[in-house]
Design a protein with these regions (language model features):
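Interfacial alpha-helical end/capping and short helix-turn segments at domain and membrane boundaries
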Residues: 50-202
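Juxtamembrane membrane-water interface segments immediately C-terminal to a transmembrane helix
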Residues: 35-57
Length: 202
């Protein structure tokens, strides 16, 4: 009888140990999964912050170069326009990777990035297109002999130049906001983006 009692207790202890082991294994597995997901999400957020920080830093440098170039020689000459097209190319990279933006947990930062890039893309397209149209109109003006037609073309050219300049000023004013967004990305990225600006200025 005593043997049976001890046998029962031994079996019960074994069962408790098995159940306890199963519970601990489940908790351990769950904790590992949660931790893995957190680390994965954190890594994706950091990569997204690095990506957008690099894009915005490059755009800030390119647009500053464009503004400096515009003040030398022909305002919308080949070099300035090449710079503006380079800035547009940076926006194209953003467009192709837009879903990466949602890896950033800060909704306010996401909204600021998206709004800023939209506000830059529209006037950039406008300035680039207007420059091409103005070039074509000037060619037409040279070939035009009719005084009325020439006067109409000259008026259109002047109006388009004013609109283009307004669009360019909007780009410059909007580009001034890039720095604050880049600064907001640095803690998330764990990286300072001043390096690009320092190299560009050296």
């Amino acid at each position: 009888m005593v043997v049976d009692t001890f046998g029962f207790l031994t079996d019960q202890s074994t069962l408790i140990a098995v159940v306890l082991g199963a519970i601990l294994a489940t908790i351990g597995g769950f904790t590992a999964t949660v931790l893995e997901r957190y680390l994965d999400k954190r890594e994706r957020e950091q990569n997204a912050a690095l990506f957008f920080g690099e894009i915005l830093s490059s755009m800030a440098v390119i647009l500053r170069f464009a503004d400096e170039t515009k003040k030398i020689g022909e305002p919308y000459g080949p070099v300035t326009m090449r710079m503006l097209r380079s800035a547009r190319s940076e926006l194209d990279i953003y467009d192709r990777n837009r879903e990466t933006l949602f890896d950033l947990r800060d909704a306010d930062l996401r909204a600021r990035i998206q709004t800023l890039l939209i506000r830059l893309s529209m006037p950039l397209d406008g300035v680039i297109e207007a420059t091409e149209e103005l070039k074509a109109m000037r060619v037409q003006l040279k070939a035009q002999r009719d005084p009325d037609e020439r006067a109409e073309l000259e008026a259109r050219i002047k109006a388009d130049e004013i609109r283009r300049e307004g669009g360019y000023e909007f780009i410059v004013n909007t580009a001034a906001q890039l720095k604050s967004v880049i600064t907001g990305l640095e803690p998330v990225a764990g990286h300072s983006f001043d390096r690009i600006d320092k190299i560009a200025r050296s």
